[in-house]
Curated annotation (Swiss-Prot):
GO molecular function, one term: microtubule plus-end binding
Protein name as annotated: DASH complex subunit DAD3
Localization, UniProt: Nucleus; Cytoplasm, Cytoskeleton, Spindle; Chromosome, Centromere, Kinetochore
Range of residues in the leader sequence: none
The keyword Nucleus is assigned to this record: yes
Any single Gene Ontology cellular-component annotation: DASH complex
Major subcellular location class: nucleus
Amino acid sequence: MSDALSTLQRSVLEKYRTLADCLHELNDTLVELNTDSDTNPEQVLAQMREIEVKIALVGTLLKGSVYSLVLQRNMGKQAPGGKAK
């Protein structure tokens, strides 16, 4: 394997590192919730539902942004007469 990484490869590895850190943090939080005797399951469930709604909203906005960007790029590639360059 080459020692020199491309910019894209470094970016992907950084994203994986960030994802791994987030997953470790999530695991720590879940362990804490499972071992904490003062935790009310109904409260945790309500909080998880709120988080789920927020994540769904962010996902929808992200998909819309990506779709808009793709459309803009496709429109930019077309000539004024409607034919592709």
